[in-house]
């Protein structure tokens, strides 16, 4: 970064005037909406003015230009001042600000990416810095470009552990292109923030996490200009002492005003007071960026060759995932992998070995890992694949939920699903993950049952919009598909069929192989079953399931290494509900499990081949 050059008095006054216009716009918009957070906006007015009209480099009419500096408003409830900034910059019409929070407007109560100037949705506090870290990592290590990343946080969200996961990450990877601005306005939503204005403690905490930390008067444009101009070979935290509701007489630094717009008469009076302080209506033009970000194309990334498995050979789908991802990495240098210190279990270590510069170790911080991936994926710069035990993704559910709201394209691979992992016990067993991922808007849920299907799932996920989840298993199972088998999202496979099938059995992963073993047992009794592999649990192949059910006297049996709630059984039941003559019977894990050998646990919880065979017999006997 350039060394600091103090702005002249004319520029400093122009920044003060800009800050006050931003205050006025925030008050007007929230009063017109009848809701919103004007006091949270007013504490950040000088910060936003200096950032956007002195420090940042961007094209004001092209907010998502890849060369632009990035900005993340982690304290998303201050959205009105972000909108005011883009009106001040000339991208939004001033009149549009008065449509804040209306159903007809794109100016939601918190930032969302239908706004061209918003890369990631915020509002669930504590997540913005992680996304900013992903952007900064991408800028420094993948794009090798000069754009910088700025993230504005509130002091309330500094109680979130995910913030400190991100602080640690930025320090470990020396993200000297990242600046976090802490808006220390003293007051939270219902009470003062725990440290209030103990600025030295904030500084010590940031420094302890390896950041260069600068305390400033957050309402002094001169101090802010100087702080933003201080370059260090480490991430920088600007700790700004501010006052909530700054400039609003009778409200500034007062409790009980969070999330409350000013009444109309009061707003008019306050606006007049603030307006009287503005010396010039002249607006400051944005400074254009240095154009050195490379062109990137992540469309239609394909495997360089077909799978190379042999039918009957055994491999765990978790290992097949690692091999597939490493292989796909040769097709595009924008495929990246992230892991939460489980790479020797998820087998993402294979990717690391072949593409070390594109592997990001996120350590045991799953929430931050998801946020990093979201940041890396912004502006279509990379195609991220995150991996950890599927059980540990449940810790990051809010980040995953917000990724969907962010319209992010990220891929998550969860290994060690179900009781079939064996001796490690219930804390490591993912038994809720299908329910979680199925509930996420924009999600696609892959559940491959062999190495070939896993490789195809990885390739499809890389080219599928939204949140993709790939569920992989620990046990080794046989390859059942030929290498040239075609797989598509939403298309199931009939793995076993005959003209005399009496029950359609649907399983995935380990339970698909148990279903095939059950078919062999039943064949000795002259009972034939049709076995379906759904491949994707969301979307589900409703047509094939219905056709198969009708061909087997309307009988469907689902079997899954997952709890009853929200898994394959409920997905299938939802797909066929209302269809006459069709019944669905479920086999699933019905209680908290325990340690044991995989085969023992499958038997204990009634999802092994014997349980499937017994259930089939029962269905036939009922007829």
UniProtKB/Swiss-Prot annotation:
Disease named in the record: Short stature, developmental delay, and congenital heart defects: An autosomal recessive syndrome characterized by short stature, developmental delay, intellectual disability and congenital heart defects including ventricular septal defect, atrial septal defect and patent foramen ovale. Cataract and uveitis are observed in some patients.
Positions bearing N6-acetyllysine: 6, 11, 144, 204, 232, 241, 260, 538, 603
Biological role: Catalyzes the transfer of a two-carbon ketol group from a ketose donor to an aldose acceptor, via a covalent intermediate with the cofactor thiamine pyrophosphate.
N-acetylmethionine: modified positions: 1
Positions bound to thiamine diphosphate: 40, 77, 123-125, 156, 185, 244, 258, 392, 428
NCBIfam families: PRK05899.2-5
Enzyme class label: transferase
Chain sites annotated for binding substrate: 37, 258, 318, 345, 416, 424, 474
Residues that bear Phosphothreonine: 287
Binding sites annotated in the UniProt record for Mg(2+): 155, 185, 187
Cofactors demanded by this protein: Mg(2+); Ca(2+); Mn(2+); Co(2+)
GO-annotated molecular function: calcium ion binding; magnesium ion binding; protein homodimerization activity; thiamine pyrophosphate binding; transketolase activity
Modified residues (Phosphoserine): 3, 104, 295, 345
Protein's UniProt name: Transketolase
Pfam families for the chain: Transket_pyr, Transketolase_C, Transketolase_N
Native species: Homo sapiens (Human)
Organism ancestry: Eukaryota, Metazoa, Chordata, Craniata, Vertebrata
Site note Important for catalytic activity, residues: 37, 258
Catalysis: reaction(s): D-sedoheptulose 7-phosphate + D-glyceraldehyde 3-phosphate = aldehydo-D-ribose 5-phosphate + D-xylulose 5-phosphate
């Amino acid at each position: 970064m350039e060394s600091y050059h103090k702005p002249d008095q004319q520029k400093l006054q122009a920044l003060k005037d800009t800050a006050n216009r931003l205050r006025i716009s925030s008050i007007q918009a929230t009063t017109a909406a009848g809701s919103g957070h004007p006091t949270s906006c007013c504490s950040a007015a000088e910060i936003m003015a200096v950032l956007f009209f002195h420090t940042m480099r961007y094209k004001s009419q092209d907010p998502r230009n890849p060369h632009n500096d990035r900005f993340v408003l982690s304290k998303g409830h201050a959205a009105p001042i972000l909108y005011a900034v883009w009106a001040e910059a000339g991208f939004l019409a001033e009149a549009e600000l008065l449509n804040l929070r209306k159903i007809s407007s794109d100016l939601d109560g918190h930032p969302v990416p239908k706004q061209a100037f918003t890369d990631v949705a915020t509002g669930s506090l504590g997540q913005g810095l992680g996304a900013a870290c992903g952007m900064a990592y991408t800028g420094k290590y993948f794009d090798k470009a000069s754009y910088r990343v700025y993230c504005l946080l509130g002091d309330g969200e500094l109680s979130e552990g995910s913030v400190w996961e991100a602080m640690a990450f930025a320090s470990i990877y020396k993200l000297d292109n990242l600046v976090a601005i802490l808006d220390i306005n003293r007051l939270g939503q219902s009470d003062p923030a725990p440290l209030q204005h103990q600025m030295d403690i904030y500084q010590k905490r940031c420094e302890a996490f390896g950041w260069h930390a600068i305390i400033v008067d957050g309402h002094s444009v001169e101090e802010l200009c100087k702080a933003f101009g201080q370059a260090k070979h480490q991430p920088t935290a600007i700790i700004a002492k501010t006052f909530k509701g700054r400039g609003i007489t009778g409200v500034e630094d007062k409790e009980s005003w969070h999330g409350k717009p000013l009444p109309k008469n009061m707003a008019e009076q306050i606006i007049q007071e603030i307006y009287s302080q503005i010396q010039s209506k002249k607006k400051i033009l944005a400074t254009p960026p240095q154009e050195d970000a490379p062109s990137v194309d992540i469309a239609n990334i394909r495997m360089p060759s077909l799978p190379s498995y042999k039918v009957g050979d055994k491999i765990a789908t978790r290992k097949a995932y690692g091999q597939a991802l490493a292989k796909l990495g040769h097709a595009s240098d924008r495929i990246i992998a992230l892991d939460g210190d489980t790479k020797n279990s998820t087998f993402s270590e294979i990717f690391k070995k072949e593409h070390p510069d594109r592997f990001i170790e996120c350590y045991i911080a799953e929430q931050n890992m998801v946020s990093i991936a979201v940041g890396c994926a912004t502006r279509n710069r990379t195609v991220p694949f995150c991996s950890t035990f599927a059980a540990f993704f449940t810790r990051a559910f809010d980040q995953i939920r917000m990724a969907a709201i962010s319209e992010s394209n990220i891929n998550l691979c969860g290994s060690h699903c179900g009781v079939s992992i064996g001796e490690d016990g219930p804390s490591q067993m993912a038994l809720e993950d299908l329910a979680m991922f199925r509930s996420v808007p924009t999600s696609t849920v892959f559940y491959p049952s062999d190495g070939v299907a896993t490789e195809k799932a990885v390739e499809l996920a890389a080219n599928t919009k939204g949140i993709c989840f790939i569920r992989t298993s620990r046990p080794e199972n046989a390859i059942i598909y030929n290498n040239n088998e075609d797989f598509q999202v939403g298309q199931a496979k009939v793995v076993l069929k005959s003209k005399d099938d009496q029950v359609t059995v649907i399983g995935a992963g380990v339970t698909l192989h148990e279903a095939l073993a059950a078919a062999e047992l039943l064949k000795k009794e002259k009972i034939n079953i049709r076995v379906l592999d759904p491949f994707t649990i969301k979307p589900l192949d409703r047509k094939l399931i219905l056709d198969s059910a009708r061909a087997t006297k309307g009988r469907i049996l689902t079997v899954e290494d997952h709890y009853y709630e929200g898994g394959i059984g409920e997905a299938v039941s939802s797909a066929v509900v209302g269809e006459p003559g069709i019944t669905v019977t479920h086999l699933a894990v019905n209680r908290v499990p325990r340690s044991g050998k995989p085969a023992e646990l499958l038997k204990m919880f009634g999802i092994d081949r014997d349980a499937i065979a017994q259930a089939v017999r029962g269905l036939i006997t009922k007829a």
